Curated annotation (Swiss-Prot):
Main subcellular localisation: cytoplasm
Domain of life: Bacteria
Region entry Disordered, spans: 193-219
Keyword Ribonucleoprotein among record annotations: no
GO annotation, biological process: cell division; chromosome separation; DNA replication
Alphabetical keyword list: Cell cycle, Cell division, Chromosome partition, Cytoplasm
Pfam families in UniProt: SMC_ScpB
UniProt-recorded name of the protein: Segregation and condensation protein B
CC annotations in GO: cytoplasm
Quaternary context: Homodimer. Homodimerization may be required to stabilize the binding of ScpA to the Smc head domains. Component of a cohesin-like complex composed of ScpA, ScpB and the Smc homodimer, in which ScpA and ScpB bind to the head domain of Smc. The presence of the three proteins is required for the association of the complex with DNA.
Family: Belongs to the ScpB family.
Composition skew (Low complexity), residue ranges: 196-207
Length: 219
């Protein structure tokens, strides 16, 4: 295969794929061994590092995706406004607890949050950000929840170890704070998303994350 033709095909695959492309999958589709597929990807990544390019190739969730460059984010946001429905504060807080304490049961999440999390869990399951990780060996064998590959993709992470360090204060229900700020680009993005407080109350109601905490329900 002519090398430039291979890069053209790889570029098309990255654009068309609904999920991060692994080197193994690229090799299978194009008909290369994995070593050559990795070299092809590295070469294409260099092409996208040129300052005039509006797109970049990022490694996340065990594969590669084609994304817009951070420098163009302001203009992309203008194009896409009004923004697609985001996650409510209740859903984000629940997701943060699951991400840092997984695998974890519903009762354990509610113990940390101090409110019921039924609707938040339903929202996160529908979005594919969390999944059933099995059953806990305890009375009633409750479901254990954990994050998914979609969670990594949603926050632009390669692996869970890139999550920013936090403290979950069980003495004050719902208190989850970063232990430090800054870090790499991915870490800053996750901090901004998980700890920014979510959408306004009207948006929370829209995605099933609203409720009255005074009645022991989701916020």
């Amino acid at each position: 295969m002519i090398w430039n033709h291979g890069k053209m095909i790889l570029e098309a695959l990255l654009l068309a794929s609904p999920e991060p492309l692994t080197i193994k999958r690229i090799a299978e589709v194009i008909g290369l061994d994995e070593r050559d597929a990795a070299l092809l990807m590295a070469d294409l990544q260099k092409d996208y590092e040129a300052p005039h390019r509006g797109l970049a190739i990022r490694e996340m969730a065990g594969g590669y995706v084609l994304t817009t460059r951070p420098e163009a984010a302001e203009y992309v946001e203008r194009l896409l406004q009004p923004k697609s429905r985001g996650l409510s504060h209740a859903a984000l807080e629940t997701l943060a607890i699951i991400a840092y304490r997984q695998p974890i049961t519903k009762a354990e999440i509610e113990n940390v949050r101090g409110v019921k999390v039924d609707r938040a869990l339903e929202t996160l399951l529908e979005r594919g950000l969390i999944e059933d990780k099995g059953r806990k060996e305890a009375p009633g064998r409750p479901i254990l929840y954990g994050t998914t590959a979609e969670f990594l993709r949603y926050f632009g992470l390669r692996e869970l170890s890139e999550l920013p360090p936090v403290e979950i204060d069980t003495s004050e229900p719902g208190l989850i704070v970063p232990t430090r700020t800054g870090g790499g680009e991915a870490e800053r993005e996750v901090q901004a998303s998980l700890f920014a407080g979510g959408e306004e109350p009207s948006a929370e109601a829209a995605d099933g994350g609203a409720g009255e905490s005074t009645h022991g329900e989701e916020e």
